[in-house]
Amino acid sequence: MAAAALNGLKMAATSQAYLESMPVNDTRKLLSDLCRHFYGLGWVSGTGGSITIKVHDESIPKPQQLIVMSPSGVQKERMVPEDMYVLSPSGCFLSSPSPKPYPNKPPKCSDCAPLFMKAYLMRNAGAVIHSHGMESCIVTMIDPLSKEFRITHMEMIKGIQGHGYYDELVVPIIENTAHERELTDALAEAIEAYPKTTAVLVRNHGIYIWGDSWIHAKTQAECYHYLFDAAIKLYQLGLDWSTPDHGPIKKYGGKTNMSVKAGTVNSNHETEPSRRCIVLDIEGTTTPISFVTDVLFPFARNNVSRHLAATYETDETQDDIKLLRTQVQSDLEQGIVGAVPIPPDDAGKEEVIAALVANVEAMIKADRKITALKQLQGHIWRTGFQNNELEGVVFEDVPEALQKWHASGIKVYIYSSGSRLAQRLLFGYTNYGDLRKYLCGFFDTTVGNKRETKSYVEITESVGVDKPSEILFVTDVYQEAVAAKAAGLEVIISIRPGNGPLPDNHGFKTITSFSDI
């Protein structure tokens, strides 16, 4: 009965009569009014930028509400209600504007449509704004290597959902592409990686901002642009907007902390390498190996059945199952010990889950570094961290070192066999609080095996250095050290309690604490 009622609701909401109803027409008019207003602010000039709003109707659940969207490549200040597109909740066109005479171009829906849909689907947004405001573009250029914009202790931060005056506002930055639609995957990854954010900056381009309603989205957009403008002005004054006191930007080697740190002189008066980036391993480097083997792995193993049963119908878990099926089929063909066939979907949920659990337990027992396992483990751990069943552990010297490197303008990345999601969780929920603010990015085995030189070549090409020697890689595994050195990276081996032995005469510098770096 409930399904039938929902289907009836969907049909009624997409009927021609409803498309001509007051809620839809009011939303069309509101959108055209906002286009003119935002044009005056410089957010949608030169036909750039776009806006979309869901048709608010108390009788229709938000996920089923229709979507009104502005067109692309048009003069936003001249928009009228009839120029707007109306889309279904899934993004199908229900109503399109009529062509206008020359010199107007044929109507075309916003190129931002796929990105707007991500905000609707992933954040249940009520409205999304894409601005080309000058301040949202320039603020991404101040530090070309930064993956985030950060600001704190500014009154207007209070206008951003979930933030107060004393909080640090963090906005992810993704790289621009030649075509708007090519940003879709990067935007989705940023939304997933930053669950608290209500905006994503696009370098040298602009910003996407969403809210529960058009008022909420508009209010936040005004606050974001104010904060970006403030950061730019503070930077021009030589003041640091990212610190509570907004004091002078610190300088290292004649450069500000917005730049990279120059080579330093050690206690023997020898010039050490100029490090622009530090790439850190996790197990045995930032975190005790025992935490992974004694806490994380058992948690995943003990909760895999519960997790699969509770989330079986979700798209995320179905993707996990698809990856596991592919991996298990390969394992069976290669005769991998512990691999058992997974029944087809029509065999029943319980049978499929039982086979999946058997395979996952065998993979964990063998400590296999494979994407299918790591991805599922990450999703299980996410639930544990969010429910306070898990807390990440790092060595006591790690937070201070990360803070020091961050202040020095050195970019710090993580490279681990664990999934990027698992890495973000570990550093986001540590015994020292959220340390992700000191990290610029995460690499996992999708970039390559950690014992292969080409993986470190790929990382070198991804972090924006001029040469591999500007990267310091810290690991506890000799084979990884050899591979990184072969790629031209500077390498240090971490000696921590519980780490495995190293070969005699291995030839690498070693440390027992990050304070030694």
From Swiss-Prot:
GO terms, molecular function: acireductone synthase activity; magnesium ion binding; methylthioribulose 1-phosphate dehydratase activity; zinc ion binding
Location of region: Methylthioribulose-1-phosphate dehydratase: 1-240
Positions bound to substrate 1: C112
Coiled coil: none
Pathway stated in the Swiss-Prot or TrEMBL entry: Amino-acid biosynthesis; L-methionine biosynthesis via salvage pathway; L-methionine from S-methyl-5-thio-alpha-D-ribose 1-phosphate: step 2/6; Amino-acid biosynthesis; L-methionine biosynthesis via salvage pathway; L-methionine from S-methyl-5-thio-alpha-D-ribose 1-phosphate: step 3/6; Amino-acid biosynthesis; L-methionine biosynthesis via salvage pathway; L-methionine from S-methyl-5-thio-alpha-D-ribose 1-phosphate: step 4/6
Active site: E155
Residues that, per the record, bind Mg(2+): D281, E283, D476
InterPro entries, sorted: Aldolase_II/adducin_N, Aldolase_II/adducin_N_sf, Enolase-ppase_E1, ENOPH1_eukaryotes, HAD-like_sf, HAD-SF_hydro_IA, HAD_sf, MethylthioRu-1-P_deHdtase_MtnB
Binding-site residues, substrate 2: S416, S417, K450
Xref: CDD domains: HAD_EP
Entry cofactors: Zn(2+); Mg(2+)
Region (Enolase-phosphatase E1): 278-517
EC number(s) from the headed UniProt entry: 4.2.1.109, 3.1.3.77
Ligand binding (Zn(2+)): H130, H132, H205
Cofactor note: Binds 1 zinc ion per subunit. Binds 1 Mg(2+) ion per subunit.
GO cellular component: cytoplasm
Superkingdom, natural source: Eukaryota
Catalytic reactions of this protein: 5-(methylsulfanyl)-D-ribulose 1-phosphate = 5-methylsulfanyl-2,3-dioxopentyl phosphate + H2O; 5-methylsulfanyl-2,3-dioxopentyl phosphate + H2O = 1,2-dihydroxy-5-(methylsulfanyl)pent-1-en-3-one + phosphate
Annotated keywords: Amino-acid biosynthesis, Hydrolase, Lyase, Magnesium, Metal-binding, Methionine biosynthesis, Multifunctional enzyme, Zinc
One example of a Gene Ontology biological process annotation: L-methionine salvage from methylthioadenosine
Nucleus recorded as keyword: no
Homology family: In the N-terminal section; belongs to the aldolase class II family. MtnB subfamily.
NCBIfam families assigned: enolase-ppase (TIGR01691), HAD-SF-IA-v1 (TIGR01549), salvage_mtnB (TIGR03328)
Protein name per UniProt: Probable bifunctional methylthioribulose-1-phosphate dehydratase/enolase-phosphatase E1 1
Organism, scientific name: Vitis vinifera
